[in-house]
Structures are given as C-alpha cells and as structure tokens.
Amino acid sequence: MKTRVEAYVKEGCALCEEAMEIISSVHEDMPFNLKKIDITSSEDIFRRYHASVPTIFINGVKSFKFKVDGEEFTKKVRMEIIKAKVRRISSKKLQYK
C-alpha cells in the first residue's frame, strides 16, 4: 500500500500554501498518495482544524502543524515508504515458507 499524506488546509492561508509547495515538490520525486482537504468543505472538519492549519498527516499520524520542514517531511515520507517495502518483502517470504 502506498504511503498516504493528508493535508488539511484553507484557501488564503499563507502557511498552507507554503506547506503545499513543499509537499508537492517532494511528491514529484517520491511515490505517495496525496489528499488535499479544504477545511471549509465540512463543518466538522472546520471545527477540528480551523485554528491549526495546515495540519499534515502521514499514514494517519499527525506529523506537522502550522509549519512543514521540507527535510523532515522528506525523511518521514521516505521512512514510511521503506517500512511499506519491508512489510511487502516480509509477507512474500512468509508466503513461500
């Protein structure tokens, strides 16, 4: 399964735009599923994140809030990709035993 990145953002938010630029740049070089969620699309989502955008989740784990560091984001995504590959290899080895 591909690594999932969910970005909770709001239009007109400078930090959100900066975060999406970093995430998009990394996405060009690394395979992961990216879902950009506008917090104004749902009242529930808006209530949860209106005071903390951008909020970035990697594989369901809150990884960044307000500021996304490009190097740290790259490391975290790379680590999740490696873990997924190891799980795939391990499951294949178990199938052949």
Features from the language model and the residues they span:
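Non-catalytic, surface beta->alpha helical segment in thiol-disulfide oxidoreductase systems
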Residues: 61-87
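Thiol-based oxidoreductase modules, predominantly thioredoxin-like and allied folds used
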Residues: 32-43, 50
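A short, hydrophobic beta-strand/beta-hairpin element that forms part of a small beta-sheet core
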Residues: 53-63
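Secretory/periplasmic and organellar redox-cofactor proteins
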Residues: 84-97
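A generic structural signal for alpha->beta connector loops
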Residues: 4, 29-33
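Local sequence-structure signature of Cys/Sec-based thiol-disulfide redox active-site neighborhoods
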Residues: 1-25
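Generic recognition of short, well-ordered alpha-helical segments
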Residues: 17-21, 47-48, 68
